[in-house]
Amino acid sequence: MTLDKFIDQAISPWMREEGPDKDIVMSSRIRLARNFANQTYPILAKEEKLVEIQEFIRDEYANKSFQTYKDLQYVPLTDLSPVEKSVLVEKHLISPHLIKHSDFAATLISENEQVSIMVNEEDHLRIQVYYPGLQLKTALEQSFALDDWLEEKVDYAFDETKGYLTSCPTNVGTGMRASVMMHLPALVLTKQINRLIPAISQFGLVVRGIYGEGSEALGNIFQVSNQITLGKSEQDIVDDLESVVHQLIEHERMARNHILERTGKKLEDRIFRSYGTLAYSRIIDSKEASKCISDVRLGIDLGLIDNTSGNILNELMVLTQPGFLQHYANRSLRPDERDVLRASVIRERLKLEE
C-alpha cells in the first residue's frame, strides 16, 4: 500500500471487518509507550539523537512484515503537507502531539492500517494496535507479540521496580493505554451520560472525546481508557476496562429500548429528519454533520433504516473532517467553503448506497 492510499481512503481496511458489540463499540485500541535505553526522551533530546532513532527504525523496520501486518510503511512527517498530517490524525493513525513535533517524527503503518508505530512522539515509540468492536484482549495479545518483535532489536528503558520508563510519569509502569471508542447516543439523549462519566472515573478510567485528551465527544462518540499504568498488570487493566465497557453497553441498550418504547415516533422522526438533512442539505457544518450521522447510525442499529450500512457512516465521520475535505478539494478551504463541500460529499456518498 502506498502513502497515497493511507491519505485517500477515509475508512481503514480493518474498520470494515465485523467485531463483537460493534453497534456500540466501534473499536478497541492498545497503545504501548516505549523508550530506548540510555537515550534522552524526545522532548529533551538533541536533534542528532532524534535523527539517529528515526534512521534506526527506518533501516530495521521499513517495508518489513510481522504476522498479518504486511509491509510496514515508513513515513517521515517532513514528507507530508499540513493537510496530509491532519488526515492521518483524523484517521487516528498519528496523534496531534506528533504533528507539533514533526521535524524529527515519523510513523510506521501496516498495509491494513491496524498497526501504527509513532516515532519520536512524547516517547521514542508509541505502538498502536486496533481491532473492530470489543476485542481488547485480542488487541493486547497482538500488541505484546508486536512489542516482543520490536524488542528483538531495541533495548527498552526498563526498571525492575517501576517497569517501563516513559517521558510522562503517568505512563510509567506498563506504559499502556487501553481504550475503546463507543457510540452512546441513547445515554446522551436520556442525559444518563452525565451521571455515568463521574462514576467511571472512580474506577481509574477516563472518558474523553473522539480524538482523545481535550477533544469534544462529536457525534456522541466517547473514548473510554485507563488512567492507571503503575501497580497493575496489563491484563488486570484490560479486565477492569472491559468490565466497565460491558456495563456501558448494557446501559446504552436499555436506554435505546426505553426511548423506542416511550417516544418511538419522535425518535423515528428525529432519525429520518437527520437522514434527510444529510441526503439533501447544501451547507452543513461539522457539528451538525456529526449529530446527524449519529442519529442515522442509531436508526441503522435499531432497524429503522435498512438502505445504509454502518461502514458508510464510519467513512463519513472521517470524510467530513476539515483535513480530509481539504485533501479532497486539493486546496485550503475557508470554513464556509468546507461546509458546502461537506454537504456535497455526504450527498454523493449516500447516493452510492441507494
Swiss-Prot record:
Catalytic reaction(s) noted: L-arginyl-[protein] + ATP = N(omega)-phospho-L-arginyl-[protein] + ADP + H(+)
The similarity annotation says:
Belongs to the ATP:guanido phosphotransferase family.
What does the record give as the function of this protein?
A: Catalyzes the specific phosphorylation of arginine residues in a large number of proteins. Is part of the bacterial stress response system. Protein arginine phosphorylation has a physiologically important role and is involved in the regulation of many critical cellular processes, such as protein homeostasis, motility, competence, and stringent and stress responses, by regulating gene expression and protein activity.
Output the HAMAP family linked to this UniProt entry: Prot_Arg_kinase (MF_00602)
Can you say what this protein is called? Protein-arginine kinase
Q: Which gene encodes it?
A: mcsB
User: EC no.?
Assistant: 2.7.14.1
Q: Which UniProt keyword terms apply here?
A: Allosteric enzyme, ATP-binding, Kinase, Nucleotide-binding, Transferase
One Gene Ontology term, aspect cellular component: extracellular space
Residues spanned by motif RDXXRA motif of the pArg binding pocket involved in allosteric regulation? 338-343
Q: Where does ATP bind?
A: 27-31, 92, 126, 177-181, 208-213
Specify one Pfam family.
ATP-gua_Ptrans
